[in-house]
C-alpha cells in the first residue's frame, strides 16, 4: 500500500467517526439517517476492532507522518473535526496529535477545547459571531465557516444569564445544552455589580503557572505542569471591566476599560508573549464526577496572583476606540470593515490603552471588536493576546443593562 493510500484510508476511517459527533446550531440540527443510529452487528463490530488494532500498531514514525499530513490537509471547520477524531482513537494517537497541532496564536485555528483559553492569532483576527436567545437568556458563540455572516458556524461556547439579588452572572460552558457550574463543561463566568458598571471575569481553572489557590487560611502554589488532579472548578479573576458615565445617555458611545489581570503589558511589545494554557486540569477530564463543587465558598485565586504577574511588569489594559461623529449620518461611527451593519450602543472596538503603552508607541491594532448585524446576531472578532473565552466574556458585559451609564 502506498503512503498516499495510507493517508486516504486513515482520513476515511476517521471521517466516518467524526461526522457522527459534529454539532450544529440550535434549531438547525442536521437529521441523521435512522440506519446510522442502529447498533452495529457482531461481524461489523469485529471488523472495526481489527481496523482499530491495525492503526494503533503503526510504527510511531509512520503514524506521526500520517497524522501530520491529515492535520495539514484539514485546515478549517468542518473538516477540522477529523483532526479531533484522530486524537480520540487511543492514547498514542492523542499524544502525537497534541504535539502536531499548534496553538491558535501560531496556526490561526481552533482545534481542541483548550484552544478557547489560548491567545488568538497574531496576523489576522478570528472571526466569530454571537447568537442571542431572548426567551432563555442564553448566548451562543460560533466561529464562522466562511466570510459570510449567515453561515451555520461551528459552536464554541454558550452562556446563560443568571440574575442574583445584588449582581448578575453569566455562566460560560462548552455545552450548549447544559450550562451549569455542576458540569465538567463549565469554564468560567462573568459577574457584574448591582449597577452593571463593573464586571469581573472568572476562569474556572488557573489561567497561568504559579497561581495561588486559597480556601480559608490555607494556600498552595500550583504550577501549570503540576496541577492537582483533584482541583474542583474555582473562581480565578482574569479580567476586570468598567463602564464610565456617559453624559449623552443611550445616544452616545460607551466608554469602557478592561484590565487583563492575567496578561502582562509586555505581551503586545516586540517579541512579547502572553501566558498560554496548554491543557485543562486532570479533574476536567476524569475527576469531576467524584468531586463535589463548592457553591457558596468556591476555591478562589489569592490576591497574590496579581503580584505574580506584576513582578515582570504591569498588566495589559484595553480601552474602547473613540468613534467619530459623522455629520452626514448624524451618528457616532467606527470602521468595522463591513463586519457590523446595524448601529447600536453595544458596538465597540478595544485597543491597548495609553497606560499600557510606556514606550509611547502607537498600538492602534484592534484587539477585539463587537457589533450588531441583526436582531439577535452580533459579530465578535478577536486576536492576540486575548483568548476566545476572554473575548466572549467581555462581549457579554455589553449586553447587560447599565443603570448608571445610560
UniProtKB/Swiss-Prot annotation:
Annotated tissue distribution: Ubiquitous.
Domain of life from the UniProt record: Eukaryota
F-box domain sequence ranges: 53-108
InterPro entries the UniProt entry points to: F-box-like_dom_sf, F-box_dom, Tubby-like_C, Tubby_C, Tubby_C_CS
Pfam family, one: F-box
Coiled coil: none
Family to which this protein belongs: Belongs to the TUB family.
Protein name: Tubby-like F-box protein 11
Amino acid at each position: 500500500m502506498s503512503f498516499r493510500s495510507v493517508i486516504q484510508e486513515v482520513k476515511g476511517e476517521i471521517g466516518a467517526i467524526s461526522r457522527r459527533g459534529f454539532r450544529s446550531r440550535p434549531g438547525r440540527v442536521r437529521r441523521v439517517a435512522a440506519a446510522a443510529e442502529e447498533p452495529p452487528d457482531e461481524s461489523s463490530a469485529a471488523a472495526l476492532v481489527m481496523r482499530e488494532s491495525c492503526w494503533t500498531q503503526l510504527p510511531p514514525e509512520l503514524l506521526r507522518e500520517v497524522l501530520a499530513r491529515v492535520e495539514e490537509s484539514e485546515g478549517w471547520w468542518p473538516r477540522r473535526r477529523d483532526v479531533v477524531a484522530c486524537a480520540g482513537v487511543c492514547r498514542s494517537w492523542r499524544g502525537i496529535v497534541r504535539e502536531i497541532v499548534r496553538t491558535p496564536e501560531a496556526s490561526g485555528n481552533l482545534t481542541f477545547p483548550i484552544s478557547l483559553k489560548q491567545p488568538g492569532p497574531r496576523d489576522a483576527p478570528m472571526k466569530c459571531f454571537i447568537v442571542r436567545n431572548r426567551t432563555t437568556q442564553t448566548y451562543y458563540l460560533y466561529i464562522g465557516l466562511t466570510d459570510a455572516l449567515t453561515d451555520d458556524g461551528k459552536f464554541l461556547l454558550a452562556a446563560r444569564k443568571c440574575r442574583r439579588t445584588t449582581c448578575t452572572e453569566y455562566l460560560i460552558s462548552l455545552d450548549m445544552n447544559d450550562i451549569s457550574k455542576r458540569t465538567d463543561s463549565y469554564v468560567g463566568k462573568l459577574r457584574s455589580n448591582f449597577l452593571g458598571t463593573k464586571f469581573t471575569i472568572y476562569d474556572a481553572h488557573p489561567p497561568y503557572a504559579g497561581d495561588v489557590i486559597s480556601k480559608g487560611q490555607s494556600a498552595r502554589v500550583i504550577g501549570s505542569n503540576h496541577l492537582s488532579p483533584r482541583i474542583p472548578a474555582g473562581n480565578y479573576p482574569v479580567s476586570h471591566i468598567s463602564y464610565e458615565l456617559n453624559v449623552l445617555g443611550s445616544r452616545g458611545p460607551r466608554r469602557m476599560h478592561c484590565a487583563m489581570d492575567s496578561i502582562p503589558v509586555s505581551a503586545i511589545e516586540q517579541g512579547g508573549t502572553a501566558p498560554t494554557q496548554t491543557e485543562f486540569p486532570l479533574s476536567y477530564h476524569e475527576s469531576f464526577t467524584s468531586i463535589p463543587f463548592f457553591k457558596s465558598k468556591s476555591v478562589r485565586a489569592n490576591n497574590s496572583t496579581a503580584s505574580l504577574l506584576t513582578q515582570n511588569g504591569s498588566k495589559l489594559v484595553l480601552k474602547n476606540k473613540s468613534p467619530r461623529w459623522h455629520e452626514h449620518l448624524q451618528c457616532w461611527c467606527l470602521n468595522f470593515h463591513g463586519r457590523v451593519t446595524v448601529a447600536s450602543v453595544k458596538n465597540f472596538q478595544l485597543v491597548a490603552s495609553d497606560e499600557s503603552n510606556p514606550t509611547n508607541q502607537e498600538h492602534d491594532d484592534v484587539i477585539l471588536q463587537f457589533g450588531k448585524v441583526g436582531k439577535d446576531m452580533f459579530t465578535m472578532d478577536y486576536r492576540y493576546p486575548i483568548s476566545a473565552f476572554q473575548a466572549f466574556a467581555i462581549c457579554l458585559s455589553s449586553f447587560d443593562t447599565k443603570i448608571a451609564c445610560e
